[in-house]
From Swiss-Prot:
GO terms for biological process: modification-dependent protein catabolic process; proteasomal protein catabolic process; protein pupylation. Belongs to the Pup ligase/Pup deamidase family. Pup deamidase subfamily. It comes from Rhodococcus erythropolis (Arthrobacter picolinophilus). InterPro entries: Pup_deamidase, Pup_ligase/deamidase. One of its GO terms (molecular function) is peptidase activity. PANTHER family: PUP DEAMIDASE/DEPUPYLASE, PUP DEAMIDASE_DEPUPYLASE. This is Pup deamidase homolog.
Amino acid sequence: MSRATPFSAVINGLTPFFASRQVICGSGRVGIGQSGDEAGFQLSQRADYIEVEVGLETTLKRGIINTRDEPHADADKYRRLHVIIGDANLAEMSTYLKVGTTALVLDLIEAGVHLTDLQLARPVTAVHHISHDPTLRATVALADGRELTGLALQRIYLDRVDKFMSAEGNDDPRVADLLEKWAMVLDLLERDPMECAHLLDWPAKLRLLEGFRNREGLNWSAPRLHLVDLQYSDVRLDKGLYNRLVARGSMERLVSEQAVLDAVDTPPTDTRAYFRGECLRKFGADIAAASWDSVIFDLGGDSLVRIPTLEPLRGSKAHVGKLLESVETAKELVDELTN
């Protein structure tokens, strides 16, 4: 994100958002507390491991906002926003809204929209409190004394993003789709979280667990429930419970399986990933290394040649497509780029 944005604005704007977005993108967890010894089900796998509001660490004293700043881009222009509070998701709607709504909120913050009125009185406690209540009725205290649910906080963010995009005249269909799905999911969650069991991870997992508990006559302290919890996320097609739900049409997908397979080897065309991917495809034998911020060529000389890719939105097909089509060898490409 832009380094010109004050980091205090990032903290103020994102802390309540991250604390509340787990109602949408939590992946569900059996057990309460870091050790999981207390019986119960909660929204998020990571919530109980968040211990401070802001911090650098990722394996202890984890923060809602992480300060690790390695942008893998032009450090004078860009700051890295290292998000460690989010769960890993399998449900496509959870992932779509997790990433998409965060991007929209960042647009607000970078534009200077003030969100200080949403500051939480006790942010870390709020993260835990929201996660521990799958009924979504738990309220958390704001610094100004108001008490709001996680759903209510998400609705405020949705409303402000919607108004901002309208004021800016933003007619991007991707933004419109995100806003529509964000609102739809919040409506369903407010009516009955189980109405999202075909869309989001934590309701899908909870539905499976409740069915298993009822069939086997188990309470939430039963060790077998932890096994079901883990098996939900098993990525093996024949073992993972999520994959079984997909196979029988019980989870709504947003992309086709073919689109997923295509994305394994076909980079997006509108970022530097296009340049990196096409270089690997055409000149893989001549590339010593490739990363976010450079492609390093080995042309057989005394030294390697590093081509920096410090601008995330340069190196797109529009920017370098014709150049890549016009050259036959890696040396020709490097000569064109360096001369």
